[in-house]
Regions:
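A conserved acidic beta->alpha catalytic loop
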Residues: 21, 34-43, 62
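Glycine-rich, basic loop-to-helix element that forms the pyrophosphate-binding segment
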Residues: 59-75
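C-terminal subregions of glycosyltransferases and related glycan-biosynthesis enzymes
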Residues: 185, 190-269
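Acidic helix N-cap motif at the loop->helix transition within catalytic regions
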Residues: 13-17, 39-47, 88, 92-94
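Conserved donor NDP-sugar-binding/catalytic core segment of glycosyltransferases
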Residues: 92-121
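Short, acidic, metal-binding catalytic loop of nucleotide-sugar glycosyltransferases
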Residues: 20-29
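Conserved nucleotide-sugar donor-binding catalytic segment
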Residues: 132-206
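Short aromatic/hydrophobic "clamp" motif used to bind/position activated sugar donors
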Residues: 80
């Protein structure tokens, strides 16, 4: 059996579709973690939990990392995966990944923005964890997130850093992959990611500040891995993400310069 952890916050319009896609995966248990929703989502979670394969956890609003941690605490199956409440798992995703995983402790499927993507030639590549980490650090937006990953519960002893607001899933995945022996990558459509309408609610200054906090939190893991070239690319990718949102806002030039200085110091370390 596979536990599917769905952190939920004010997802009244999308949750049922996400849950339906999860139930279609076969032998799964769905853990809905309601993070203090205020729009009727909590009541919907209770209604959905009448299904024998759905359980619900209600908690006060502490953010997506706290919700994922509550799901990890409740997980009991050999394997687990995460699904955001406004995304969907593609048909047969879990079954295909389980079949291809073999003895690997984690396997990553393909993430798409289409619910009817082209079907790739089904292949799987098994890598030592260090090789996977090198690849992930060089391409964090492709690999360092929870989307499309199927993980053995035994490697998920780490918890999400609840103080982080952006890039927190990538920082967690780094720590999880650090504890693996082999990881598989599968050319299998697994996860459909929907662009968030609220993904730009942060001001540019907040985005820079939060990504900088994530880089600082990731520093001990990067030091432990001792992969300087890959780590430099990881930091540079975060710098590009910050620049995409704009480092300097009107009236915030000095603050932007200070934060750029902090980024440069991190890169030198």
């Amino acid at each position: 059996m596979v536990d599917i952890i769905i952190p939920v916050y004010n997802a009244l319009d999308t949750l049922e579709l996400a849950v339906t896609s999860a139930l279609m995966q076969g032998d799964v248990r769905i853990l809905l973690v309601d993070d203090g929703s205020t729009d009727g989502t909590a009541r919907l979670c209770d209604e959905l939990a009448h299904h024998p394969r759905i359980a619900v956890i209600h908690q006060r609003n502490h953010g997506v990392s706290a919700a994922r941690n509550a799901g990890l605490q409740a997980a009991a199956s050999e394997w687990l995966t995460f699904l955001d409440a406004d995304d969907v798992l593609l048909p047969d995703a879990i079954g295909n990944l389980l079949t291809l995983a073999g003895d690997s402790q984690a396997i990553q499927g393909l993430v798409t923005r289409s619910e009817a993507p082209d079907v790739p030639e089904c292949t799987v590549q098994t890598l030592p964890s260090r090789d996977m980490l090198d690849l992930a650090l060089r391409n964090p937006t492709v690999h360092l997130h929870t989307h499309g990953w199927l993980l053995r519960r035994e490697i998920c002893n780490e918890r999400f850093n609840e103080s982080l607001r952006l890039g927190e899933d990538g920082e967690w995945m780094m720590r999880v992959l650090r504890g693996t022996k082999t990881v598989a990558r599968a050319q299998v459509n697994a996860y459909c990611y929907h662009l968030r309408a609220d993904s730009a609610v942060h001001s540019a200054a907040d985005v820079v500040r939060e990504y900088l906090r994530t880089l600082t939190a990731a520093q001990p893991t990067l030091n432990y891995l001792d992969m300087p070239d890959a780590a430099a690319q990881y930091r540079l990718m975060h710098l590009l993400l910050m620049l995409t949102h704009g480092v300097v806002q009107e009236g915030g030039f000095r603050d932007g310069l200070r934060q750029c200085g902090a980024i440069r110091r991190l890169c030198r370390e």
